[in-house]
């Protein structure tokens, strides 16, 4: 009995021993695997990846292509050159290959050569664009984005148009304003810089921009800017003056045609014998002969006797003893008569629409007063 009782007691530990040993062995295996992985991570963390070469991918590709005797390489040959030259491309990191492919396809300085017959599939040769070789001379690897040359070529016309907007080469060869007896022709090179800038500022309206009247439409500029341009204009004298008012413009005669004898007359005979008048106080009147349909004797005049004699007062104010006229043209008339002065709103559009036929469209004004002044002849 004792032996039978002892046998189960001996067998029970034998059956229970494998159950107790298994839980003890499994944690040991897990800890060993985790310790090996951490050791591997520690060893990998200690090893640093080689430093990237201090060149852009464009420069690296150019180095590879220029190293070839034929100046062309395939994509795989470019990979081999970079891996043999720089340790950075030998590691486990493979993202640089995508960068090489993108730079080859996205930059215009690289050209994909067409493959010959009998070579299907991959393996295209890449070379450097001959127009872009200057970018990489003497080791100067300058990055140029896609479409750089197109942008440079597109900027050239815009710069040219901007320079034209400032008044350079802005006027065509001639402006012909047909009036009663002829036309006005102004060369394009005589436009001053101030008048060109005034055109851009919008002081001259529509069709009157080419006549160079910047001195009469821009109070902030000196009047010699307009006269310097009109002084170089040449006009064809007409045979007769039309039957309308002659106060259209101090620079033009009654028919819209500049008299060549009236531009910059430097003799003293062009000045009136009467003492100089003053325009500062607005009390004196300028004498002028009326040319109206009511006066038939004044309707036709010879071109040799010009109605207006234009003179710049700032050039002759010391010789003639006048200090009140500052940059305002003076006039000499054959038979002076009293004229009235009226205020009006200065408008170039009215002058162009009426072709300078209305008596109220005068092109000069007195700047010292608030409103512009018009010197008009009395209609008899």
Curated annotation (Swiss-Prot):
InterPro entries (alphabetical): Fork_head_dom, Forkhead_box_regulator, TF_fork_head_CS_1, TF_fork_head_CS_2, WH-like_DNA-bd_sf, WH_DNA-bd_sf
PROSITE patterns with a match to the protein in the record: FORK_HEAD_1, FORK_HEAD_2, FORK_HEAD_3
Chain intervals with Polar residues compositional bias: 1-19
DNA-binding region location: 52-146
Alphabetically ordered keywords of this record: DNA-binding, Nucleus
Superkingdom to which the source organism belongs: Eukaryota
Main location per the UniProt record: nucleus
Stretches for region Disordered: 1-49
Gene Ontology MF term list: DNA-binding transcription factor activity, RNA polymerase II-specific; RNA polymerase II cis-regulatory region sequence-specific DNA binding
Keyword Hydrolase found: no
Keyword Cell division: no
One GO cellular component term noted in the UniProt record for this chain: nucleus
Record localization: Nucleus
Protein name: Forkhead box protein F1
Organism, as annotated: Danio rerio (Zebrafish)
